[in-house]
């Protein structure tokens, strides 16, 4: 997508090789694979590849999310061809040498050890285990399972690259100072020989919580408790997703524009932070409220959050609150559209999940069209107050309510 007045181009290359497409029962393979891909190619080692990138004054990173592995970066428009060649070299012909796996394994295990001491990470993992059954791709954080990381073999890494990193289902988005025709030619030159693999495919059973589930995990030497309260959300392709985004904003997404955020943090001072997110991916990602609180305030913060949720479910939503939530979402969208990276991200989401070529233009109107009745219906259907998962991590936690 061409954006006038710029000298740079933002690039996003998404491949359906994230958590959702990992080998069953092997959480962590996707992340190990992408990290190993950055450790050199069949043409040059990691240092030489990095030097070539630096010579262009460009940036690049490769991350694994719940749905995709995403190569993201930026270069000057004049260097786009050379930049795409470097990206293709890493994606299509990584060396994936045994020593590369050992390097990323060591770093990943060190990160896992650090996360064991981090109350946010501990609470998030505990919540996932409460919510998702064994074998579900979202039961584990993207960093993976410690045993899988320790035992992963280079053959698994190469197999995941072969089976998951391929052009089928992959999307390249370029936004910024570019001529569309020329950009297509450069992309074709860089990736035209990329082949192999079959379209990714995986299905998981719907996740439904049958009761309230609660777990408290003691993390030594901590003074703050972190809370994750949530439910399995909606797949991004669900036609109700935009309504759910508005409901999320009304509920707790933001301390300025959301009820729980305002009351729990600003009015009552029960939390250091409060926010909620709804994950947009191929399956039911987390719809979760996250809070950091003084351990003495854990039960009250949870109770007040449920009180605000019950008000929403009962239809006690002020017109101003709904308008503020819609304005906040549209405002975030407009801010994103001011940068090439933001535009690229929106186009990428639309392409990955089949939201339509007019998604960027239609999305603000869809947000504005969400009514109070829509929010109540979403909260009633997807945020039951008697069926949820609640995880707390920190010092000794008071008994459950």
Residue ranges and their predicted role:
Residues 130, 171-174, 323-401:
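C-terminal regions of mature proteins
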Residues 4-7, 29, 62-66, 137-141, ...:
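Short, flexible turn/loop "capping" segments at secondary-structure junctions
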Residues 291-319:
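Extended amphipathic alpha-helical segments enriched in small hydrophobics
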Residues 1-56, 72-75, 85-87, 158-263, ...:
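His/Glu-rich zincin catalytic helix
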Residues 49-160, 181, 307, 323-345:
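Acidic/histidine-enriched segments that form metal/cofactor-coordinating
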Residues 198-205, 275, 315-324:
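Flexible, glycine/charged-enriched surface loops at secondary-structure junctions
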Residues 228-232, 252-293:
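A structural supersecondary motif
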Residues 25, 29, 45, 49, ...:
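Stable alpha-helical elements in mature extracytoplasmic
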